[in-house]
């Protein structure tokens, strides 16, 4: 289900502070490491690189214009598909 329109998009406060610090040139422009997969991508994030945790490792996500409005977790898959079970000795 979609979030109610009367509510603002969710962004973790600590993540937003890191983004604002980079945009104001208070800290060097390097990837922002985050565990907050549920944070919504704002237009301010365009051009920044986030390292989003997928449960095992951090996945680099470079934010482009098309990603605005989506969640950070959508771009860091948590599951790997290894194929359906097949009889390997059947060949």
UniProtKB/Swiss-Prot annotation:
Belongs to the universal ribosomal protein uS19 family. One of its GO terms (biological process) is translation. One of its GO terms (molecular function) is structural constituent of ribosome. PROSITE patterns: RIBOSOMAL_S19 (PS00323). NCBIfam families: rpsS_bact. Protein S19 forms a complex with S13 that binds strongly to the 16S ribosomal RNA. This is Small ribosomal subunit protein uS19. GO terms for cellular component: cytoplasm; small ribosomal subunit. The keyword Coiled coil does not apply. PANTHER family: RIBOSOMAL PROTEIN S19P FAMILY MEMBER (PTHR11880), SMALL RIBOSOMAL SUBUNIT PROTEIN US19M (PTHR11880:SF8). Keywords: Ribonucleoprotein, Ribosomal protein, RNA-binding, rRNA-binding. Pfam families: Ribosomal_S19 (PF00203). The keyword Transport does not apply.
């Amino acid at each position: 289900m979609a979030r109610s329109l009367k509510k603002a998009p969710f962004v973790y406060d600590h993540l937003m502070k890191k983004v604002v610090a980079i945009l104001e040139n208070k800290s060097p422009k390097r990837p922002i490491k985050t565990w907050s997969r549920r944070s919504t991508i704002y237009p301010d994030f365009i051009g920044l690189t986030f390292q989003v945790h997928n449960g095992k490792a951090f996945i680099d996500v470079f934010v482009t214009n098309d990603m605005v409005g989506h969640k950070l977790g959508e771009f860091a898959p948590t599951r790997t598909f290894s194929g359906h079970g097949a009889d390997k000795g059947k060949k």
